[in-house]
Amino acid sequence: MEQAPPDPERQLQPAPLEPLGSPDAGLGAAVGKEAEGAGEESSGVDTMTHNNFWLKKIEISVSEAEKRTGRNAMNMQETYTAYLIETRSVEHTDGQSVLTDSLWRRYSEFELLRSYLLVYYPHIVVPPLPEKRAEFVWHKLSADNMDPDFVERRRIGLENFLLRIASHPILCRDKIFYLFLTQEGNWKETVNETGFQLKADSRLKALNATFRVKNPDKRFTDLKHYSDELQSVISHLLRVRARVADRLYGVYKVHGNYGRVFSEWSAIEKEMGDGLQSAGHHMDVYASSIDDILEDEEHYADQLKEYLFYAEALRAVCRKHELMQYDLEMAAQDLASKKQQCEELVTGTVRTFSLKGMTTKLFGQETPEQREARIKVLEEQINEGEQQLKSKNLEGREFVKNAWADIERFKEQKNRDLKEALISYAVMQISMCKKGIQVWTNAKECFSKM
């Protein structure tokens, strides 16, 4: 009974890990084992189509978006967008893939799926959904969530969300995810029957744990700072890109004025008419090309936005760890308090001021039978508290191991995806500049022939 309670911070750390960003053989092996569970041909962290057996067996696509009108829970008419999810077998028949399932889902159902995954897989960096309303838009881009271009970009984002889940070695095996792809009727009821809402941590409790935890894990504190920095950098990049798009759009459209001037000028010139007409045509082509260019840019902006929203998924893992750490510290504190009470009853000495000590002085000592009964109750509570503390320690260790394995997987994915997106964006900018040079070269030749 006199044994000091174990240090919850030491118990919550199963083994020393490398700093953020450093490779760790043990964690890599853990990721590999999880991947092996998803399929014999699974190969750990790789591209989406090589992560597990799911995407080797079926193709998942959100192939169509449709505007619909219906009644909501308040029996009020509303307009919404439904998305057609198709799954096809990769095993071809007569040279064509076989359509296995096809159903329509609303955006709110995608949100329900993600909320469920967040509760049941708190140690996993759950893929984010695309934005519900347009953010970081430049002035010519519509912010209306029913705009066809925005709906199309969101359709692509929702397809990417499903592919992210299907490529994850753990999430891909979830039954609710499988039913999301195959069961159109009563799917919401099936999700609600899991009782995931009751298991969700309250925001107030999470906020309380954030400020009251005494021994936070430095790795998760660093991870939280990393997610804040990631969000800040990508937000700044997207804001700058929106301002540049505004300016670039204006520069290109000015060339449309040049084209109109040259065309009108050619009508009053006899010798220079053909050259001016050709130069005006080149200016018009250049001015109209900006629409396709900025449409392509939105594709790369959406890739950046995905990782902007991933930052919140990282913070969700950190919040869960803080909650578990706080619960562990409270359990250790409660156990230490009970041990002290038991020791005071056995020895008859009171170390600190207590209400019980005051009542003893006022109303006299307890009888030996009463004291023995209290000691017995406290000993039972201490045994129960030790078991509870041990259970929380094991749960915490398992959470840290699994969470860190998935964080390392996410960071490799992030580095690969952002590198590819930024390189492709740079190549697109180079191509755009080359086309601009070519237009002015052609215009120069037209002028030189006058």
Curated annotation (Swiss-Prot):
GO terms for molecular function: epidermal growth factor receptor binding; insulin receptor binding; leptin receptor binding; phosphatidylinositol binding; phosphatidylinositol-3-phosphate binding; transferrin receptor binding. InterPro entries: AH/BAR_dom_sf (IPR027267), PX_dom (IPR001683), PX_dom_sf (IPR036871), PX_SNX4 (IPR034902), SNX4 (IPR034783), SNX4_BAR (IPR037430). Heterodimer; heterodimerizes with SNX7 or SNX30. Interacts with WWC1/KIBRA. Identified in a complex with WWC1/KIBRA and dynein components DYNLL1 and DYNC1I2. Interacts with BIN1. Its main location: membrane. The PX domain binds phosphatidylinositol 3-phosphate which is necessary for peripheral membrane localization. SMART domains: PX. The modification N-acetylmethionine is found at residue 1. One of its GO terms (biological process) is protein transport. One of its GO terms (cellular component) is early endosome. Involved in the regulation of endocytosis and in several stages of intracellular trafficking. Plays a role in recycling endocytosed transferrin receptor and prevent its degradation. Involved in autophagosome assembly by regulating trafficking and recycling of phospholipid scramblase ATG9A. Residues 61-187 form the PX domain. It is found in: Early endosome membrane. A 1,2-diacyl-sn-glycero-3-phospho-(1D-myo-inositol-3-phosphate) binds at residues 106, 108, 132, 154. Keywords: Acetylation, Endosome, Lipid-binding, Membrane, Phosphoprotein, Protein transport, Transport. Coiled coil: none annotated. Gene3D superfamilies: Arfaptin homology (AH) domain/BAR domain, Phox-like domain. This is Sorting nexin-4. Residues 1-46 are annotated as: Disordered. Belongs to the sorting nexin family. PROSITE patterns: PX. The modification Phosphoserine is found at residue 22. Pfam families: PX.
